[in-house]
Amino acid sequence: MCIRDRSYAGASSFFKLKDTITRLTGFEYIIPTHQGRAAENVLFSYLVHEGDIVPGNSHFDTTKGHIEGRKAFALDCTVDEAKQTQLEVPFKGNVDPAKLEKALQEHADRIPFIIVTITNNTAGGQPVSMQNLREVRAIADKYGKPVLFDSARFAENAYFIKTREKGYQDKTIKQITREMFSLADGMTMSAKKDGIVNMGGFIATNRKDWYEGAKGFCVQFEGYLTYGGMNGRDMNALAIGLDENTEFDNLETRIRQVQYLACKLDEYGIPYQ
């Protein structure tokens, strides 16, 4: 943070951040923004149009707002178990494959992409399994649709895959993260969550058409492409935060704290999701 680069264009801090994001996710095209909802605004300005339908798992409020504000529709395809707050199942944030397939059968020509929120924030931060991500990818490929991850808590999602899904116990968080993102065409990120910083966000993708289409809106709404509303300090901090928070011990510390609180709530009979 102390050696940040405040250059308007071509700041070294941006390239440190870009290299970290690419190493963790595999995505080559990066657009920084000042926070997650700004990333949605920039990308959706290119992707979402009036009358579109965007299916996903319990869209976050800003995601839904950016879709509906463009006179499009956010279609919830979350599994029914997510509505039962006291039901304990490993992956209550999953997309329901049957609901998603039905949406594509009926409205394929109006669907620009499928969005998966990891973890499912609106449904209480419930995780999405790797198997479910593969199912979504297969359905998307069947209908020729891209997949976008809303990734504010992607590292926590990787943690739950490691601790709850068969075959992942011996994989590192970084390995699981890379596998998750291999099933998506792009991501938006609110960095104040799993980036463990107090400001920032970004878009990342391997689709050049998404990058080329969105970058003009970044300049219009956020700033030049190598800072996008973030200063050098914040970009340097985010590069470190993403790296540190994709380590198991760091994630487990916070999740165990939440688990402790949940056990206390159970003692007093207070429901929670």
Predicted regions and their residues:
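Short, small-residue-biased leader/transition segments that mark boundaries at the very start
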Residues: 1-3
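Conserved PLP-enzyme active-site core in the AAT-like
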Residues: 8-30, 34-272
